[in-house]
């Protein structure tokens, strides 16, 4: 386990630099990022989970539509829906999928002007390039970047994250309660 532990210890040291770079990247690209109405995040291998987490955080915090795809799967049908309001973010871990992540970012840049690569060397100056230092814990290195993106986006679009949220109170959300299930399927309105 020693090699894994040594690899894991690299991650916290990289977080400060990644966070600082993410804040600067967001400031430089804020207009383009805010102008999007849909965010599509791509990641290969362990970065697929980061793409999913990033999409979830954008929806939770910034109240914008977002979806995360596995890099290979997302390069087919979903690209047919891209338009000038679609922001595409490809996560590049510098390993498996790196070439496709760069290609995805490049394609989105030329199609909508809202394509970005996070991690690795990037494609151009609008990308968030950083050194990926871990082999087996890359996802932990990328997590702060997508979390900061969601947070900064929420600030830019005016979402008050300190305001309490009340989840919808509808019968649908009580589906695990047997009486609610009975009333829904029987047509009874309680």
Region annotations inferred by a language model:
Residues 1-190:
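A SIS-like phosphosugar-recognition module
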């Amino acid at each position: 386990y020693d090699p894994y532990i040594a690899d894991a210890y690299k991650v916290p040291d990289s977080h400060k630099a990644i966070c600082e770079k993410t804040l600067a990247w967001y400031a430089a690209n804020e207009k383009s990022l805010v102008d999007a109405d849909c965010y599509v995040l791509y990641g290969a291998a362990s970065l697929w989970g980061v793409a999913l987490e990033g999409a979830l955080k954008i929806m939770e915090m910034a109240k914008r539509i977002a979806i995360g795809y596995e890099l290979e799967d997302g390069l087919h049908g979903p690209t047919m829906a891209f338009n000038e309001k679609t922001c595409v973010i490809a996560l590049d871990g510098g390993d498996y999928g790196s070439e496709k992540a760069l290609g995805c970012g490049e394609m989105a840049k030329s199609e909508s002007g809202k394509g970005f690569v996070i991690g690795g060397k990037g494609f151009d100056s609008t990308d968030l390039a950083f050194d990926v230092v871990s082999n087996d814990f890359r996802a932990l290195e990328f997590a702060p970047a997508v979390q900061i993106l969601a947070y900064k986006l929420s600030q830019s679009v005016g979402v008050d994250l300190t305001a309490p949220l009340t989840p919808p109170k509808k019968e649908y959300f009580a589906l695990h309660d047997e009486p609610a299930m009975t009333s829904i399927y029987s047509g009874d309105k309680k």
